[in-house]
């Protein structure tokens, strides 16, 4: 190759533009009436970043960039302009505006770089053609403008003229895409591919920096503890937005780290705090990031700008809020509740179809082949197929799964990850944690485009789908013959059955009874693992919620925090294959591209339980919200939960939910107020075991701590109430479960309805819905990770409370009335008035119905658990007697017509004469007690 003559390359001191003629160039124009925001880069651009040296498309096409030199700063009197003056340049691009400060020499360096770029491009044949014949809307020649010569600072008028010269110089350059998109220009303007994405908020602060390695406040990520002594400096491009900062690799453009602002946020300048000359230190709860600037003045400027940005729309995340939550209450939020999986899954499916950018999912267990709308007649509503279709459309799907201890749990998250990752490159799945731990990621969350979020007790997994019918059988039609079998996979496609004539609601592993048999062989999803001809399924009752707007942003931020935390802490996820995620700005949260029907206007606050092992920070705002809501309730509490392990003794059990309930009832009793507490629990814990022989060690361990909370021992709720008021406790609290019946094999069958809900309703005005059980695992924060929302009504409607007129919240009232209606069988009793939950007549009806139903079920099925079996000996005698359902099915059917709804009393005397703690020699007995509580 012929050497380039050195004379073609300017030294940077020459500012003569005579050899910089341009034939023509495009002129940025917008159509009349066109909004510049419509041309800005889409949010998905964050996943397609390029090297900062390859001239990526930074500016929105057709949207002009304008500059204005708005002032100067002199910081050394008597010096020359080129060394003592900073020019403040105000730039505008559409709705974005920002200020950069430059010395005169920065203009000189830019001028030199653009000259070199012009000369180099003219030497390349194809590039020369592109320069000479670039499209134009005007025929006028354009040339590289000249810089004013540097000289001594003169009068104010002279300084103003220099500002105008620089302003005109820059504006002429910015009309030419040949120079405007060159990396030297974008670096000078402090812009990147992340600058003009509306959902990321305002432009923010950007620039080239040197950052120091380390500083992570995560065990194992620092070389020598917190005060790291072995580190390296790396050159990166820093981007600061209103609630986070990030830095990018210059060579690839990939995001190398994201630091979310939180209550630990602090910015410091100086060698004492940074151990670096011209250093800036940015602290959050997760990391202490140290940057090195070119001068102390630049360090002060950057620190000031970062602090001001953090005080903008993202300032909510710089402090803890009510209940010590990371998120504040968000008024004006559209929220909709779901009872049972049918409605929840269908709404999730509809939201997935509307996704345009991102889908976030985190679950304790996720079954890729679960159907979201049923009965399924094709694969259109199968979760993995839906995610694959959206990924093919360009939507980015990020999934976080709990990585279980395989010897203890059979949810096979490894299979779920492999099955999903093979579908499309846009689907990314991470599992956490790697280390063996006693605790779990128990939260359930799905977020679409960071504007709509689902959460509650429902995993997108087998066994969760149900409706208000709580069917015990699924034989596909009215026939109960053995010939009625669910569809089996086609020979040519072993993973997918033929569904063209399907009438089944639960296919393969979805037909389940978790006490009869736990799930096995999950990699064979369409094969039954229990005999549906002889074994009834166990109905699944659960509650979920969907929220829009700002709370969805808060929930997305939680997911992003966990995702980025996992990526940072696990070596296998540090590759660019797993991208860092970025939270959208709260400033655009109310621009909803879609909403789900049925939402009601409420105030919503996101709550969570997290610890350093799970998310890098500690929070137990769910517990705080439970305690506060119970303490401040005036009329009643309605609690549905999978577990109820509480009443602190300061040693084994630490949460005080049960204690607050006792205190609130005692206060009402002392003051003579009408106050009710309704508690609904599953009649048995959801572990595999033969209850006819006592249920197995796992079932008995949970029963032990449940009864310890409810009625056994000095710390229990009923023991403390009886000590204070005798039998009057029955006027204040009701503890029940749910049961149903059906037909299978020609005779009646019964099964408990497994309550998996995690919901609290107070006074028909306040609701807590989430994934958190009432136990230490879910509530302390240091154990399982959980999510919940506190929903407060802002719209009311007339109702009743203890016979008096009462303004009830629409969200809470509608949810409570729906729950009561299904539980009490209101569909067969149109005269049942559910408005007043605490009057004597209603409370007595509730208690009588629970007692009557329990007696009928015991008489017909001799079902367990039962108050008649207070020891293992009486249990053996009890199950030895043939039930009426087997001896005389016709008589049993006749008696069952008297059952109303599903409500039954919780058997408080079941095995009360036995010690239910696991034997010390058993594997369950060797597990720490904290696992059960």
From Swiss-Prot:
It comes from the Eukaryota. PROSITE patterns: PLD, PX. GO terms for biological process: cytoskeleton organization; Fc-gamma receptor signaling pathway involved in phagocytosis; G protein-coupled receptor internalization; phosphatidic acid biosynthetic process; phospholipid catabolic process; regulation of vesicle-mediated transport; small GTPase-mediated signal transduction; synaptic vesicle recycling. The keyword Disulfide bond does not apply. Its EC number is 3.1.4.4. Keywords: Cell membrane, Hydrolase, Lipid degradation, Lipid metabolism, Lipoprotein, Membrane, Phosphoprotein, Repeat. It catalyses: a 1,2-diacyl-sn-glycero-3-phosphocholine + H2O = a 1,2-diacyl-sn-glycero-3-phosphate + choline + H(+); 1,2-dihexadecanoyl-sn-glycero-3-phosphocholine + H2O = 1,2-dihexadecanoyl-sn-glycero-3-phosphate + choline + H(+). Residues 203-311 form the PH domain. Function as phospholipase selective for phosphatidylcholine. May have a role in signal-induced cytoskeletal regulation and/or endocytosis. This is Phospholipase D2. It comes from Homo sapiens (Human).
């Amino acid at each position: 190759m012929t050497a380039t003559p050195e004379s073609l390359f300017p030294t940077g001191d020459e500012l003569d533009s005579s050899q910089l003629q341009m034939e023509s160039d495009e002129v940025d124009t917008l159509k009349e009436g066109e909004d510049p925001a419509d041309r800005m880069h889409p949010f998905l651009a964050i996943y397609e970043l390029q090297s900062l040296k390859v001239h990526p498309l930074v500016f929105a096409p057709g949207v002009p960039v304008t500059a204005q030199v708005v002032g100067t700063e002199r910081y050394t009197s008597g010096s020359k302009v080129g060394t003592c003056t900073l020019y403040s340049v105000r730039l505008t691009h559409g709705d974005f505006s920002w200020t950069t400060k430059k010395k005169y020499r920065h203009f000189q360096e830019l001028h030199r770089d653009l000259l070199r770029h012009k000369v180099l491009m003219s030497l390349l044949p194809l590039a020369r053609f592109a320069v000479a014949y670039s499209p134009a809307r005007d025929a006028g020649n354009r040339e590289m403008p000249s810089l004013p010569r540097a000289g001594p600072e003169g009068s104010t008028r002279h300084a103003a003229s220099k500002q105008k010269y620089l302003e005109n110089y820059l504006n002429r350059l910015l009309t030419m895409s040949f120079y405007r998109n060159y990396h030297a220009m974008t670096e000078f303007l402090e812009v990147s591919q992340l600058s003009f994405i509306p959902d990321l908020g305002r432009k923010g602060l950007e620039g080239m920096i040197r950052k120091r390695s380390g500083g992570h406040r995560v065990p194992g990520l620092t070389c020598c503890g917190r005060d790291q002594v072995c580190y390296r400096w790396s050159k990166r491009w820093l981007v600061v937005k209103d609630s986070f900062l990030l830095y990018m690799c210059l060579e690839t453009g990939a995001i190398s780290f994201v630091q979310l602002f939180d209550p630990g946020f602090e910015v410091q300048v100086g060698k004492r705090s940074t151990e670096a000359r011209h250093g800036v230190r940015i602290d959050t709860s997760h990391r202490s990031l140290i940057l090195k600037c070119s001068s102390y003045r630049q360090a002060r400027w950057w620190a000031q700008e970062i602090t001001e940005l953090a005080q903008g729309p993202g300032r909510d995340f710089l402090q803890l809020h009510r209940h010590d939550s990371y998120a504040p209450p968000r008024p004006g939020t559209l929220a909709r509740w779901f009872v049972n999986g049918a409605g929840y899954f269908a709404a999730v499916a509809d939201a997935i179809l509307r996704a345009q950018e991102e889908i976030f999912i985190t679950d304790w267990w996720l079954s890729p082949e679960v159907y979201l709308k049923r009965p399924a007649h094709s694969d259109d509503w199968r979760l993995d197929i839906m995610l694959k279709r959206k990924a093919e459309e360009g939507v980015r799907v990020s999934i976080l799964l709990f990585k279980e201890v395989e010897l203890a749990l059979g949810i096979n998250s490894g299979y779920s990850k492999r099955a999903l990752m093979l579908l499309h490159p846009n689907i990314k799945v991470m599992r956490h944690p790697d280390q063996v731990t006693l605790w779990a990621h128990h939260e359930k969350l799905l977020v679409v485009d960071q504007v709509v979020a689902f959460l509650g007790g429902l995993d997108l997994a087998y066994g969760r789908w149900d409706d208000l019918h709580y069917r015990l059988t699924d034989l596909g039609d009215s026939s109960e013959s053995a010939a009625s079998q669910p569809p089996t996979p086609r020979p040519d496609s072993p993973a997918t059955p033929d569904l063209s004539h399907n009438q089944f609601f639960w296919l393969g592993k979805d037909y389940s009874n978790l006490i009869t048999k736990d799930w096995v062989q999950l990699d064979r999803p369409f094969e039954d693992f229990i005999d549906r001809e002889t074994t009834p399924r166990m109905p699944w009752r659960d509650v979920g919620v969907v929220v829009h707007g700002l709370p969805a942003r808060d929930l997305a931020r939680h997911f992003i925090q966990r995702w980025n935390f996992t990526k940072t802490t696990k070596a296998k996820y540090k590759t660019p294959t797993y991208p860092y995620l970025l939270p959208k700005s709260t400033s655009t949260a109310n621009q909803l591209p879609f909403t789900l029907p049925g939402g009601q206007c409420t105030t919503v606050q996101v709550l969570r339980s997290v610890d350093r092992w799970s998310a890098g920070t500690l929070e137990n705002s769910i517990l705080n919200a439970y305690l506060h809501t119970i303490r401040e309730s005036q009329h009643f509490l309605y609690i549905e939960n999978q577990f109820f392990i509480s009443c602190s003794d300061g040693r084994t059990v630490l949460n005080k939910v049960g204690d607050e309930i006792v205190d609130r009832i005692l206060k009402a009793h002392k003051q003579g107020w009408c106050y009710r507490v309704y508690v609904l629990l599953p009649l048995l814990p959801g572990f595999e075991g033969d209850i006819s022989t006592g249920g197995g060690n796992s079932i008995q361990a949970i029963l032990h701590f449940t009864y310890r909370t409810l009625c056994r021992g000095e710390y229990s709720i009923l023991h403390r109430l009886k000590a204070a008021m005798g039998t009057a406790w029955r006027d204040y609290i009701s503890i029940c479960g749910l049961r149903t019946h059906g037909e299978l094999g020609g005779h009646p069958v019964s099964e408990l309805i497994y309550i998996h809900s995690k919901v609290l309703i107070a006074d028909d005005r306040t609701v807590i819905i989430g994934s958190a059980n009432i136990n230490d695992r879910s509530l302390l924060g240091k154990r399982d990770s959980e999510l919940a929302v506190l929903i407060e009504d802002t719209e009311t409607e007339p109702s009743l409370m203890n016979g008096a007129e009462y303004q009830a919240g629409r969200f809470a009232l509608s949810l409570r009335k729906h729950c009561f209606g299904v539980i009490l069988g209101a569909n067969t009793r149109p005269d049942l008035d559910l408005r007043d939950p605490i009057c004597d007549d209603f409370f007595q009806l509730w208690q009588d119905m629970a007692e009557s139903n329990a007696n009928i079920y015991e008489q017909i099925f001799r079902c367990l658990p039962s108050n008649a079996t207070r020891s293992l000996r009486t249990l053996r005698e009890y199950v030895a007697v043939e039930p009426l359902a087997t001896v005389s099915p016709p008589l049993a059917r006749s008696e069952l017509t008297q059952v109303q709804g599903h409500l039954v009393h919780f058997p408080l005397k079941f095995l009360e004469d036995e010690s239910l703690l696991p034997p010390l020699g058993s594997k369950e007995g060797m597990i720490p007690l904290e696992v059960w509580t």
